[in-house]
C-alpha cells in the first residue's frame, strides 16, 4: 500500500492507496477534531448495490450513518440532486460537525463534495473513489455540478479530509470505465512525469494490465503529479490549468454528444490528441503525433467523430472555463512534460479541427 501526502494552502491530508485501504476509514473518522456527530454517505445506484454495505460495515463507530443514493450517470450531477441531497441532510439532522462520505466515481465525488462545501457553509467530507478516473477528481478539492450550458460550471474549492482508494472496488468496473480512467493517467504522465509515460508504453499493452501491483504503481505515480500542481496553485489561478490538457475539446465533445454518450476519458483522449496535433503546428515541433494516435487507438479510444459540426465545437470550446474575453485558451505541449496555456484564435482552431477531423477518419 502507498500513502500520498497532499499539501495545499488550505489543508493537508493523505491519500491511502491499496488493497486494504478501507481499513483506515474508522481511524480517519475517529481522529477528526471536533468529533464527528453523524455521517451521510452519498453514492449512486450502481456503486451502492456493490459497495455501500461494505463501507457501512467498515465504519466501526457508534454514530448514525445514513445514505443518499442517486441514479448513475454524469447527467445526475445536477442541481436537482444537489438540492435533494441538502433536503436529506436536513431531514437527517446533519450539523456542522457531521461528515459526508463520497462513495463512487468522479460524478459522485463532485456532487457530494459540493454538497459538503455548501451545507451550512461547509462541512467535512472524505472521498472513497471507486473508479480509475476518480484518481484525478478525488484529489485537489474541485467540486461541482453541471449546468445545461456547461460542465462543472457551478462549484467550489473544498478539500477532503482524506481520500481512501480501496483498489478492490475497481475490479467491478466495465472496460469502458478502465479506458476512461486510463486517459487521465496518460494525461498526468504527459504533462508531469515523462518517466511514467515511457513506463506505460512498455508495461501497459492492454487495459487488462491495469490490475494489482501495476495498478497501485500507476496510482502512486499519477496522483503525485496532480498533488504537486495543486500544491502550487490550489484555486486554478495559474499552473493548475495545466491539468486541463485535452479537456477543452474533451468537454466540448461531451456537451455536443450528450453526457453519457461519450465517457469523460474518451473525450479527453480525443482532446489530448488534438492538443498534440495543434501543438506541433503552433510550436513547430515534432511530438510524434502519428505514433501517439496509434498508441491511443490500441487501447480503443475513439476517433474524432466525422459528422460533428466544427463551428459548433469551436463555440462550445469558447465556453470553457479557461476562456478569457471570448478567446479560446488551450493547454498546448512544447515537449513531453512541458505544457502552457495558450490563447488560440478561433480561425486557427477551426482550421486545425477540420484537418484533425479528416486525419482521424
UniProtKB/Swiss-Prot annotation:
Species in which this protein is naturally found: Bacillus cereus (strain ATCC 10987 / NRS 248)
Positions in coiled-coil regions: none
Pathway where it operates: Metabolic intermediate biosynthesis; chorismate biosynthesis; chorismate from D-erythrose 4-phosphate and phosphoenolpyruvate: step 2/7
UniProt-recorded name of the protein: 3-dehydroquinate synthase
Binding site for NAD(+): 72-77, 130-131, 142, 151
GO cellular component, one term: cytoplasm
GO biological process, any: amino acid biosynthetic process
EC number: 4.2.3.4
Cofactor info, note text: Binds 1 divalent metal cation per subunit. Can use either Co(2+) or Zn(2+).
Amino acid at each position: 500500500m502507498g500513502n500520498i501526502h497532499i499539501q495545499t494552502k488550505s489543508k493537508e491530508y493523505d491519500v491511502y492507496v491499496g488493497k486494504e485501504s478501507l481499513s483506515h476509514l474508522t481511524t480517519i473518522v475517529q481522529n477528526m477534531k471536533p468529533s464527528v456527530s453523524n455521517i451521510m454517505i452519498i453514492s449512486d445506484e450502481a456503486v451502492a448495490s456493490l459497495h455501500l454495505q461494505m463501507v457501512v460495515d467498515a465504519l466501526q463507530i457508534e454514530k448514525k450513518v445514513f445514505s443518499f443514493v442517486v441514479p448513475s450517470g454524469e447527467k445526475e450531477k445536477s442541481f436537482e440532486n444537489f438540492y435533494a441531497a441538502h433536503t436529506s441532510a436536513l431531514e437527517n439532522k446533519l450539523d456542522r460537525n457531521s461528515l459526508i462520505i463520497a462513495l463512487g466515481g468522479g460524478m459522485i465525488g463532485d456532487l457530494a463534495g459540493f454538497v459538503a462545501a455548501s451545507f451550512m457553509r461547509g462541512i467535512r467530507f472524505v472521498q472513497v473513489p471507486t473508479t480509475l478516473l476518480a484518481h484525478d477528481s478525488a484529489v485537489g478539492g474541485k467540486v461541482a455540478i453541471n449546468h445545461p450550458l456547461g460542465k462543472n460550471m457551478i462549484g467550489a474549492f473544498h478539500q477532503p479530509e482524506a481520500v481512501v482508494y480501496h483498489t478492490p472496488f475497481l475490479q467491478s468496473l466495465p472496460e469502458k470505465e478502465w479506458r476512461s480512467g486510463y486517459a487521465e493517467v496518460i494525461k498526468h504522465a504527459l504533462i508531469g512525469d515523462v518517466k511514467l509515460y515511457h513506463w506505460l508504453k512498455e508495461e501497459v499493452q492492454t487495459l487488462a494490465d491495469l490490475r494489482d501491483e501495476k495498478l497501485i504503481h500507476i496510482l502512486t505515480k499519477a496522483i503525485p503529479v496532480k498533488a504537486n500542481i495543486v500544491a502550487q496553485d490550489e484555486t486554478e489561478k495559474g499552473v493548475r490549468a495545466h491539468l486541463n490538457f485535452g479537456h477543452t475539446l474533451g468537454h466540448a465533445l461531451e456537451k455536443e454528444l450528450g453526457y453519457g454518450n461519450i465517457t469523460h476519458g474518451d473525450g479527453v483522449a480525443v482532446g489530448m490528441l488534438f492538443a498534440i496535433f495543434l501543438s506541433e503546428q503552433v510550436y513547430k515541433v515534432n511530438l510524434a503525433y502519428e505514433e501517439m494516435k496509434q498508441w491511443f487507438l490500441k487501447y480503443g479510444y475513439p476517433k474524432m467523430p466525422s459528422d460533428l459540426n466544427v463551428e459548433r465545437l469551436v463555440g462550445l470550446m469558447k465556453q470553457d472555463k479557461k476562456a478569457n474575453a471570448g478567446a479560446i485558451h488551450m493547454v498546448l505541449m512544447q515537449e513531453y512534460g512541458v505544457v502552457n496555456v495558450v490563447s488560440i484564435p478561433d480561425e486557427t482552431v477551426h482550421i486545425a479541427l477540420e484537418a484533425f477531423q479528416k486525419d482521424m477518419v
